[in-house]
């Protein structure tokens, strides 16, 4: 049995209630649930939450909420991996040694069923612990700058001041959408950003962090443009 687990706590600060806030016609979490259900590569979609309203919305969209996440895993400091580990442990009776787990973020309206299928296929064929979505940086990270305490500019890597962009290695970052992993990898809390993982590459125009009101507005505009 393959399971998609969507972590969705109720205490978001910068965008209050963002997991159930309406995004282009439906609660944000609804987009992730629907993509997982339509993918035909998971047998169930489980939402891990501490919040009754999120649980109610999740059930409405066809997900299961078989447990309430404990408060110790719902604060501002707990990472995703222990949350997924807890969910896997709670679902032990439904899983077997071949079960594969997809951590799917609640704030991933750009994720598609095809993306999830690609991730599962790569996990099965690559022998990796994890497979997750990535995209490329729009600008060479080797030419990044910082603003110091005196409001002056410094290069992070000054040795690349005169290096042409096309001569710099392309860099990638986590797309923040989904993370397929083996049951053992999640239970063992293995390192996701390491040599045990493989990527599913997404185009930059389908990747958007949604952490601030400005992010939210940009995501809505982009989403509507892609739907038109």
Tell where the protein language model's regions lie, with residue ranges.
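Short, structured coil segments at secondary-structure junctions
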Residues: 41, 61-63, 149
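Hydrophobic helical membrane-anchoring modules
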Residues: 199-201, 206-228
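Conserved core of the sugar-phosphate nucleotidyltransferase
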Residues: 82, 109-196
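Catalytic metal- and UDP-sugar-binding loop of GT-A-like glycosyltransferases, i.e.
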Residues: 104
């Amino acid at each position: 049995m393959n399971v998609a687990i969507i972590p969705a706590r109720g205490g978001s600060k910068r965008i209050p209630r963002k997991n159930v806030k309406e995004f282009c016609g439906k609660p944000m979490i609804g987009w992730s649930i629907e993509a997982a259900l339509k993918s035909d590569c998971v047998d169930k979609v489980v939402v891990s939450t501490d919040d009754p309203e999120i649980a109610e919305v999740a059930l409405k969209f066809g997900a299961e909420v078989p447990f309430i996440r404990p408060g110790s895993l719902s604060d501002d400091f707990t990472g995703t991996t222990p949350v997924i580990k807890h969910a896997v442990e709670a679902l032990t009776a439904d899983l077997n040694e071949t079960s594969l787990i997809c951590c799917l973020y609640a704030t991933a309206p750009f994720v598609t069923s095809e993306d999830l299928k690609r991730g599962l296929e790569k996990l099965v064929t690559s022998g990796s612990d994890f497979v997750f979505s990535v995209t490329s940086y729009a600008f060479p990270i080797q030419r990044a700058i910082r603003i110091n305490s005196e409001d002056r500019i410094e290069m992070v890597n000054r040795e690349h001041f005169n290096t042409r962009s096309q001569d710099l290695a392309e860099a990638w970052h986590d797309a923040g959408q989904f993370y397929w992993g083996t049951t053992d990898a999640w239970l063992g809390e293995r390192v996701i950003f390491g040599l045990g993982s493989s990527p599913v590459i997404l185009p930059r125009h389908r990747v958007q962090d949604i952490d601030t009101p400005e992010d939210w507005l940009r995501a809505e505009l982009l989403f509507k443009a892609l739907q038109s």
